[in-house]
Amino acid sequence: MSRTENIEHVEESVESELKQPSMYKVILNNDDYTPMDFVIEILQLFFRKDEAQATEIMLAIHHKGKGICGIYPFGIAETKVAQVNQFARQNEHPLLCSLEEA
């Protein structure tokens, strides 16, 4: 086998072994105490939603009990959940952010 054929074989092996990472939904859960404006602020600050998108998600959270903020690989989703929960506690709100497999 020539050097070129060997390199091509290795490239094909690597490409066939790679797979997409598992994706996770980052979810905000409704509660009776967190103000709607604070939920909108969270969505804009941590998930880069514009005001219209943030309002739509906030209303889904309010009416359905939870809303999806975004779908990310596990590491990113886990970080966002931790950041949101920490920010909510710092601002004395019981808002709960969680993740589930997409």
UniProtKB/Swiss-Prot annotation:
Database matches in InterPro entries: ClpS (IPR022935), ClpS_core (IPR003769), Ribosomal_bL12_C/ClpS-like (IPR014719)
GO biological process: protein catabolic process; proteolysis
Source organism, top-level taxon: Bacteria
NCBIfam families according to UniProt: PRK00033.1-3, PRK00033.1-5
Family named by the database record: Belongs to the ClpS family.
Function: Involved in the modulation of the specificity of the ClpAP-mediated ATP-dependent protein degradation.
Subunit structure: Binds to the N-terminal domain of the chaperone ClpA.
Designated name of the protein: ATP-dependent Clp protease adapter protein ClpS
Phylogenetic placement of the source organism: Bacteria, Pseudomonadati, Pseudomonadota, Gammaproteobacteria, Alteromonadales
